[in-house]
Amino acid sequence: MTDKLTEICDTKRNEVAARKGAVTVSELTARASEQSAPRGFEKALRGKAAEGFALIAEIKKASPSKGLIRPDFRPADHARAYQAGGAACLSVLTDAPYFQGHEDFLVEARAACTLPVIRKDFMVDPWQCLEARAIGADAILIIVAALSDQQMAEIEAAALEQGMDALVEVHNEEEMERAARLRSRLIGVNNRDLKRFVTDLATTERLAPLAPDGTLLVAESGINTHADLLRLEKCGARTFLVGESLMRQADVEAATRGLLFG
């Protein structure tokens, strides 16, 4: 695990331990049962990717490497703009210490649109899957670099039990091999090197041929233009996760449309 990722996950484990003490499993289960059914995150992506480009548009206020990204941060407005611009799904950052995220941002975004939403956070405990469903998440993220094979399998099983999908994120060949051992065939390639925090679209191009049969490959990070989508389509990627380059635009809807359709 990279140093920054180790630090973030250590912080997250302490945070989860504290939250576990503040709410019972039965309370979370009750909240989860009150939520509307999962909206079908992977299904929505596969449907869009079958006819064109599928976009997971990210609602992100800040990041450790870039600081504040969107000063006038309004999750509900951004969600509506992304949907109007043609996004297939949303990603909402809920990590507070490093990304200035919050659970409420996901709740607000999901209520403002009809798109499936992934809770973008650092999953270190299966308990977080129940918590994610309790706030309405339709999918969760599994970062291979942050977890052992057993931890990944347990978190994936907990997500599936709640009817959610799991986006499995990799950055190199070894992680792709480990991701293939899971049931999920929704695999994201992070083009950002978490050790050096530089991005290179060639990462997706290199790893795409190694994805297991039946995989819906998601290219993540460093994607800024329609030309980037056309480049990555050549290696088989038709699904993309984009946040920062869209969140920095004054007109998010127009920027989303421009990214998808040129």
From Swiss-Prot:
One of its GO terms (biological process) is L-tryptophan biosynthetic process. It catalyses: 1-(2-carboxyphenylamino)-1-deoxy-D-ribulose 5-phosphate + H(+) = (1S,2R)-1-C-(indol-3-yl)glycerol 3-phosphate + CO2 + H2O. It holds the Pfam family IGPS. Keywords: Amino-acid biosynthesis, Aromatic amino acid biosynthesis, Decarboxylase, Lyase, Tryptophan biosynthesis. The keyword DNA-binding does not apply. GO terms for molecular function: indole-3-glycerol-phosphate synthase activity; phosphoribosylanthranilate isomerase activity. SUPFAM superfamilies: Ribulose-phoshate binding barrel. Its EC number is 4.1.1.48. It is an enzyme of class 4 (lyase). Pathway: Amino-acid biosynthesis; L-tryptophan biosynthesis; L-tryptophan from chorismate: step 4/5. PANTHER family: INDOLE-3-GLYCEROL-PHOSPHATE SYNTHASE (PTHR22854:SF2), TRYPTOPHAN BIOSYNTHESIS PROTEIN (PTHR22854). Belongs to the TrpC family. This is Indole-3-glycerol phosphate synthase.
